Amino acid sequence: MLANIIRIATRQSPLALWQARYVQQCLNHLYPDLHVELVPMVTRGDIILDTPLAKVGGKGLFVKELELALLEGRADIAVHSMKDVPVEFPDGLGLTTICERDDPRDAFVSNRYDSLEQLPEGSCVGTSSLRRQCQLRARRPDLVIRDLRGNVGTRLAKLDNGEYDAIILAVAGLKRLGLEERIRCALSPEESLPAVGQGAIGIECRLNDDRIRQLLAPLNHPATAARVQAERAMNVRLEGGCQVPIGSYAELEGDTLWLRALVGAPDGSQMIVGERRGNVSDAEQIGIALAEELLAKGASAILQAVYHESSSS
């Protein structure tokens, strides 16, 4: 491996390529003599577009092919949306760098209505996220929630074709693609608790590759890393994947980390919520403790029902 080359494994969607190019630009700024190459590839999650994500099954739908490239030495790092990163990694790989978080909120997108409250009874809202579905149904049980797959451009086209009255996307993704004007309103965490790691970019690499880890070190954002660590620790304890009705969002107030979380039945009939505060140095323990609280309130029954539904479909 030449010392002045680094290869980035990335998905081929416009948003994934934006994220990979962002990391590429950061590295080029830090190391002007470094040659940074993109290695675009297709993942299973990109191919299976006619099935709701929760029913596709398995974890790491958007990362496994990238991880294989790392293990086989075809790439040096993989760039991910943190909300797509599974709770476990293959032996020898790990998440070493989390870049500064962008806006973590969900976006309400519609051509006719300015907010969720304005939607008439029976309006059709598109999202494949069980997390978004359960919160939408709990708040507006009179709406029709339908699955919506594809990249951001595909989803917007389906909205524009009249298939949906509104759709829910991530604010960060729309901003990164220069589509901020499509956002009618951003949903606060109180209205729609974000996904674990939403708005943050993570970088995975071989744990024994000291050269790469040293190059990546300046890209790590400690405050973001602590927040995401708490969110992911909670998700790990709940044994949650990417396609589960779990929301988790941490904020920093000085040295205090405030973590909020929910586990919801996809039909909106039940929502288990909790929150916990503690010193930022205890981020992982805060996440685990909050997960234990949710489990004690009955979260495991909701999650088991979701897993049973996805495995039997």
UniProtKB/Swiss-Prot annotation:
One of its GO terms (molecular function) is hydroxymethylbilane synthase activity. The keyword Repressor does not apply. The keyword Protease does not apply. InterPro entries: HemC, Porphobilin_deaminase_cofac_BS, Porphobilin_deaminase_N, Porphobilinogen_deaminase_C, Porphobilinogen_deaminase_C_sf. Pathway: Porphyrin-containing compound metabolism; protoporphyrin-IX biosynthesis; coproporphyrinogen-III from 5-aminolevulinate: step 2/4. Monomer. This is Porphobilinogen deaminase.
